């Protein structure tokens, strides 16, 4: 009998073991769809990005008009650009839901998988930031100026670091050129890290909604979850195309329709919606270095999740107090996102400070305490 090529071929064997014959818990819910959705997002972004890069010019005098030219004169250029810009939003929606799922069900106890995931998030944030600068509109320019300027808060080496990043004494042509190079490079780095992420995941196997070992009860990934994933893809593409075709500028900033002008500062400088929660935390501290540290901590705190887990049960499925706290944290993140989009004035300043304080308190103090309390409750 001839050997099964899918199981014997050196390359196909790897694909088979990760996408076809992969033993999967039978009870994973739709919350487990977001990993594959992120993969599809990445592929879509690389494809649309490549097509956009073919028509883009990374020069301060031409960048804005080259993007306008793509939208006006290139076949379906407007569609490619809208899919790429809104695809970034969907990428972040998926990654935030994916992280939320991991947090709720205790998936962070697979430390290597979790840590590579956090590194992926940081790389994605860097990619989105440098990408937002490329159209060279007002918000692109001032966003780049404000965020890169934060590095100057680092003691001793800060100013040198910023000038080195800018390639001069302000955000200018060298900055745009290197940001384009980075924006082209980073997605491939994300793709590489994704393989590392999956390698670590397949060492342990997937977690499941009950947070218990399911080795005795697994089913093959194909056809069950391939079909389930295709349903997820269809729904996401439906939402993405609807957004890109009906209201492509809904999530963008109108300020970015004005070409970059270093002499005119926009009234409210704010990043894209997916960074607003971190931006609100940055603004809530009146000291520059303190704000930068809080901004970094807001994302890096995810690395601490495995060490702050004090509960005997893995998932929050049967832990009502932790569930309540989790949803308070989610609501808190929505408040931070909203505050980040508002001007720096009363009452938004105090709301932002309270929400930032609550964010860190919940993650660092309340979750471990509630976990330990629930352990005590198991005895009664």
From Swiss-Prot:
Instruction: Indicate which residues the UniProt annotation says bind heme b b562.
Output: 84, 183
Q: Does Ligase show up as a keyword for this record?
A: no
InterPro entries with a match to the protein in the record:
Cyt_b/b6_C, Cyt_b/b6_C_sf, Cyt_b/b6_N, Cytb/b6-like_sf, Cytochrome_b, Cytochrome_b_C_euk/bac, Cytochrome_b_N_euk/bac, Di-haem_cyt_TM
Q: Which cofactor does it need?
A: heme b
A GO term, aspect molecular function: ubiquinol-cytochrome-c reductase activity
GO biological process, any:
mitochondrial electron transport, ubiquinol to cytochrome c
Keyword field: Electron transport, Heme, Iron, Membrane, Metal-binding, Mitochondrion, Mitochondrion inner membrane, Respiratory chain, Transmembrane, Transmembrane helix, Transport, Ubiquinone
Q: Name one Pfam family in it.
A: Cytochrom_B_C
Q: What PROSITE patterns does this protein map onto?
A: CYTB_CTER, CYTB_NTER
Binding sites annotated in the UniProt record for a ubiquinone: 202
In the record's cofactor note, how is the cofactor described as bound?
Binds 2 heme b groups non-covalently.
For this protein, the record's SUPFAM superfamilies field holds:
a domain/subunit of cytochrome bc1 complex (Ubiquinol-cytochrome c reductase), Transmembrane di-heme cytochromes
Top-level taxon of origin: Eukaryota
Q: Got a GO cellular component term for this one?
A: mitochondrial inner membrane
Topology class, membrane:
Multi-pass membrane protein
Q: Where are the transmembrane segments?
A: 34-54, 78-99, 114-134, 179-199, 227-247, 289-309, 321-341, 348-368
Q: What does the entry list as the binding residues for heme b b566?
A: 98, 197
Query: Localized where?
Result: Mitochondrion inner membrane
Cross-referenced PANTHER family: CYTOCHROME B
What's this chain's function?
A: Component of the ubiquinol-cytochrome c reductase complex (complex III or cytochrome b-c1 complex) that is part of the mitochondrial respiratory chain. The b-c1 complex mediates electron transfer from ubiquinol to cytochrome c. Contributes to the generation of a proton gradient across the mitochondrial membrane that is then used for ATP synthesis.
Leftover remarks: Heme 1 (or BL or b562) is low-potential and absorbs at about 562 nm, and heme 2 (or BH or b566) is high-potential and absorbs at about 566 nm.
- Subunit structure, interactors included: The cytochrome bc1 complex contains 11 subunits: 3 respiratory subunits (MT-CYB, CYC1 and UQCRFS1), 2 core proteins (UQCRC1 and UQCRC2) and 6 low-molecular weight proteins (UQCRH/QCR6, UQCRB/QCR7, UQCRQ/QCR8, UQCR10/QCR9, UQCR11/QCR10 and a cleavage product of UQCRFS1). This cytochrome bc1 complex then forms a dimer.
Family, similarity comment: Belongs to the cytochrome b family.
Name of protein: Cytochrome b
From which organism does this entry originate? Procellaria westlandica (Westland petrel)
Gene that specifies this protein:
MT-CYB
